Amino acid sequence: MMMFGKISRQLCSLKKIPWSCDSRYFWEWLNTVFNKVDYERLRDVGPDRAASEWLLRCGAKVRYCGHQKWLHDYNTLPGSSIDRYKIQAIDATDSCIMDIGLDHMVGLEHVEKITLCKCHYIEDNCLQRLSQLENLRKSLLELEIIACGNVTDNGVIALRHFRNLKYLFLSDLPGVKDKEYLAQVFKTALPSLELKLNLK
């Protein structure tokens, strides 16, 4: 007890960090915890269930193959026959997904659509990592990236590796500067791609 009191007094004597700064670090730490990959869980329940848990924990929504309804509540995840629920679409609007969690997506084979909107932790390295996932390269048909302020031309260019991509919508990305060059890159790499740019 004496030791705790001594440490407590020392901590109290330190210059206080402003609450907003302190709060920001707390939330960043918590979001990092939410994104941490549990490889044992991944092995035990399979990629679609583990990825569903991760995405919902981070505030995203998922839709399974053969279902119209979006799942957004962690407590409503299907409990039985987890093997038959395959993720077809991901809506990560306002979610805290980040690059350290992307290993959850390695085994996903049926994802056709991803929406990344107002994802503050999505950066170029996240898009580059996503574009390296072989299963996603094959399955992804539609991708929307909206209001992700840390994305630049370098991250967007990596998306050309999604060889079956049919639709790409990019909007409100202040870090993306050369839209003419991007349009040319995608026209060359993915001639059948419908590219919509709403960039300044």
Curated annotation (Swiss-Prot):
Compartment(s): Mitochondrion; Mitochondrion inner membrane
Keyword set, alphabetical order: ATP synthesis, CF(0), Hydrogen ion transport, Ion transport, Leucine-rich repeat, Magnesium, Membrane, Metal-binding, Mitochondrion, Mitochondrion inner membrane, Repeat, Transit peptide, Transport
Gene Ontology biological-process entries: ATP biosynthetic process; proton transmembrane transport
Transit peptide residues according to the UniProt entry: 1-25
Gene3D superfamilies xref list: Ribonuclease Inhibitor
GO molecular function: metal ion binding
UniProt GO cellular component terms: mitochondrial inner membrane; mitochondrion; proton-transporting ATP synthase complex
LRR repeats: 62-87, 88-116, 117-141, 142-173
Residues given in the record as Mg(2+) binding sites: 59, 93
Assembly with partners or alone: Homotetramer. Associates with ATP synthase.
Family per record: Belongs to the ATP synthase subunit s family.
Job description of the protein: Involved in regulation of mitochondrial membrane ATP synthase. Necessary for H(+) conduction of ATP synthase. Facilitates energy-driven catalysis of ATP synthesis by blocking a proton leak through an alternative proton exit pathway.
Name this polypeptide is given: ATP synthase subunit s, mitochondrial
Organism: Mus musculus (Mouse)
Biological classification of the source: Eukaryota, Metazoa, Chordata, Craniata, Vertebrata
